[in-house]
């Protein structure tokens, strides 16, 4: 039979002094957390700054190679795809693929397009979204309580601990 791992005893305070000490410790730990997060972000920034030129140089080296491979493959597409029987051409070191993107719609000037569609009677191209008005439900809580699936939450309280900190000036 497996042995049960004992859980850590629950921390309890019985005096104001203990609570004050705990709030001070929360502040100290929070500041240390912030300091470490800042240090981590500084190192991430320095690392990114260090590698950015190298990555850019590699990308600039890759781009002409990609263009040349694409030009060759486009020029020899029939031979590589067995006259369109396949969409992939295999080479010893890798493969190239031709993939048709699905159709998409790009809209510039959405308001003008919307007005035109409405004016021309193209309502089938307009989507009307319905959603529940939560503000109206909150304004009429007595009516809302009688609706199945609707719950009005009231009197919820958050407990916030704010250790005092001196602002550096």
Curated annotation (Swiss-Prot):
Keyword DNA-binding: yes
UniProt keywords, alphabetically: DNA-binding
Cystine residue pairs: none
Cross-referenced InterPro entries: Host-nuc_inhib_Gam
Superkingdom of origin: Bacteria
A GO molecular-function descriptor: double-stranded DNA binding
Residue intervals passing through the bilayer: none
Pfam families linked to this entry: Phage_Mu_Gam
Biological processes per GO annotation: DNA protection
Stored SUPFAM superfamilies: Gam-like
Homology family: To phage Mu protein gam.
Task performed by this protein: Protects linear double-stranded DNA of Mu genome from exonuclease degradation.
UniProt-recorded name of the protein: Mu-like prophage FluMu host-nuclease inhibitor protein gam
Organism: Haemophilus influenzae (strain ATCC 51907 / DSM 11121 / KW20 / Rd)
């Amino acid at each position: 039979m497996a042995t049960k791992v004992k859980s850590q005893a629950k921390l309890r305070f019985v005096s104001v002094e203990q609570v004050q000490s705990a709030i001070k410790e929360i502040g100290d730990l929070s500041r240390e957390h912030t300091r470490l997060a800042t240090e981590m972000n500084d190192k991430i920034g320095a690392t990114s700054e260090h590698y950015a030129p190298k990555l850019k140089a590699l990308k600039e080296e890759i781009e002409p190679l990609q263009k040349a491979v694409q030009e060759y493959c486009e020029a020899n597409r029939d031979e590589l795809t067995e006259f369109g029987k396949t969409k992939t051409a295999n080479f010893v070191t890798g493969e190239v693929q031709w993939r048709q993107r699905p159709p998409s719609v790009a809209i510039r000037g959405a308001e003008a397009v919307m007005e035109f569609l409405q004016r021309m009677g193209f309502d089938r191209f307009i989507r009307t979204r319905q959603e529940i008005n939560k503000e109206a439900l909150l304004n009429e809580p007595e009516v809302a309580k009688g609706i199945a699936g609707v719950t009005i939450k009231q009197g919820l309280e958050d407990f916030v601990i704010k250790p005092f900190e001196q602002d550096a000036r």
